[in-house]
Amino acid sequence: MDSQRNLLVIALLFVSFMIWQAWEQDKNPQPQAQQTTQTTTTAAGSAADQGVPASGQGKLISVKTDVLDLTINTRGGDVEQALLPAYPKELNSTQPFQLLETSPQFIYQAQSGLTGRDGPDNPANGPRPLYNVEKDAYVLAEGQNELQVPMTYTDAAGNTFTKTFILKRGDYAVNVNYNVQNAGEKPLEISTFGQLKQSITLPPYLDTGSSNFALHTFRGAAYSTPDEKYEKYKFDTIADNENLNISSKGGWVAMLQQYFATAWIPHNDGTNNFYTANLGNGIAAIGYKSQPVLVQPGQTGAMNSTLWVGPEIQDKMAAVAPHLDLTVDYGWLWFISQPLFKLLKWIHSFVGNWGFSIIIITFIVRGIMYPLTKAQYTSMAKMRMLQPKIQAMRERLGDDKQRISQEMMALYKAEKVNPLGGCFPLLIQMPIFLALYYMLMGSVELRQAPFALWIHDLSAQDPYYILPILMGVTMFFIQKMSPTTVTDPMQQKIMTFMPVIFTVFFLWFPSGLVLYYIVSNLVTIIQQQLIYRGLEKRGLHSREKKKS
């Protein structure tokens, strides 16, 4: 085995992974959404058994902080729209990214309220409460660190329910506090609920990037309990009515997409019921309902929960709820991606540029792997030295494959050569490469992060394809500088076109990943020369020109 065969192995592994990824994306196609008209009035009907109400018509009020621009419906107090001013919709756009939306084409809302036997949001008690508010617009003023949005409702029995949204400067966590004043003569039995609902199928204007070779990050529901730190729940599973229904103390429920998330975190000492529901009209929901509490006559009961609505910033999410930071989708290589991101973020705190941080982390990773790389090249050199003996052995033993295998193993043992020694570093590099890919695709910090010159977004492909071409050139030089024992004409042709094949694949890859691969190839060229000089002194390498 030589370095060119290693390139072939890399290509086969890479292509196999991309085929598997495409198969994963297509094997469970999203169900076709029905018309979503009038979903604001029928949204939660299928969840009635949970005591979760349908929406209704009310007045829309605006709530703005430095990082959130929310629209809340006074009918029930649901958050029907959420804009994120700090995150542009697109590069160089003045429009903020919209996370929550209520339109005929797409529904994504954060519902909450008070249900249970005596809750005003219980469908059995009539329409959802129509809250009174002091004004139609609330804005966090300069010098103000907290904004409160109180909403009040008094039922026919004179009981007063106050729902207060509390937002803080620079914070994507919204506290939702409830106060229940019992004006009657009997105890009130109240439960809190929080529900996230979303159209299963994305409309064309939101479904971007699905036609290229990029890895597809998870979009769907998720939940966390003390027993299950993080569990995904696919939309198509909900659409098939295979729904979640568990009890938990603590935890959270969420809906996820690339870079952004919404989550309800209940705060109570009792047990919560976590559920999913197919609401019809092509809409899926995940939510929680708390254990009922009693508010005695003449007393006031207090309950609260937290809504996260914003980017998946890991340290901030971890501070809001245990394991909420796990919503960042690093795929099955999360155990590599997470420490890589922490190291990258630490480097960025000094450098201030994510592109240069990627370059530095590449040098660190390749430096750590240098002993393995050296062992790989040494093993391949020893294998090349044994080729004449192996060829003679094959000629002597003919078609006796069992004898050939036995004598080859004896030869390897006598010469202290591991035939798999050249593959081991390869098996380590591939997961690191893929983990970096997941990190670039899942870390919101790298979304629209500029590098230099024409690279304005490291998470997007190079608009001029310059980096992929440079990557192909470096790969070509590595191939030309590597000694080879490949004699099969077909393998030789494959190796000749390998840089071209990789270049084509990398045209659609994030610029940050291509940058990593270019720097890694340049480091490989330098390390190659250093290792070959050492091997020459040991008589294991010759600088003879490669035969074409």
Swiss-Prot record:
Record InterPro entries: Membr_insert_YidC, Membr_insert_YidC_N, YidC/ALB3/OXA1/COX18, YidC/Oxa/ALB_C, YidC_ALB_C, YidC_periplasmic_sf
An example Gene Ontology CC term for this record: plasma membrane
Record's compositionally biased regions (Low complexity): 30-50
GO biological-process terms attached to the record: protein insertion into membrane; protein transport
Subcellular compartments: Cell inner membrane
Entry keyword set: Cell inner membrane, Cell membrane, Chaperone, Membrane, Protein transport, Transmembrane, Transmembrane helix, Transport
Keyword Transmembrane helix: yes
Pfam families referenced in this protein's UniProt entry, alphabetically: 60KD_IMP (PF02096), YidC_periplas (PF14849)
Region of interest (Disordered), residue spans: 28-55
GO molecular function: membrane insertase activity
Transmembrane segments: 6-26, 350-370, 420-440, 458-478, 499-519
Membrane topology: Multi-pass membrane protein
Annotated family: Belongs to the OXA1/ALB3/YidC family. Type 1 subfamily.
Functional summary from the UniProt entry: Required for the insertion and/or proper folding and/or complex formation of integral membrane proteins into the membrane. Involved in integration of membrane proteins that insert both dependently and independently of the Sec translocase complex, as well as at least some lipoproteins. Aids folding of multispanning membrane proteins.
PANTHER family documented for this protein: CYTOCHROME C OXIDASE ASSEMBLY PROTEIN COX18, MITOCHONDRIAL, OXA1
Name listed for the protein in its UniProt record: Membrane protein insertase YidC
Organism: Escherichia fergusonii (strain ATCC 35469 / DSM 13698 / CCUG 18766 / IAM 14443 / JCM 21226 / LMG 7866 / NBRC 102419 / NCTC 12128 / CDC 0568-73)
Designated gene of the protein: yidC
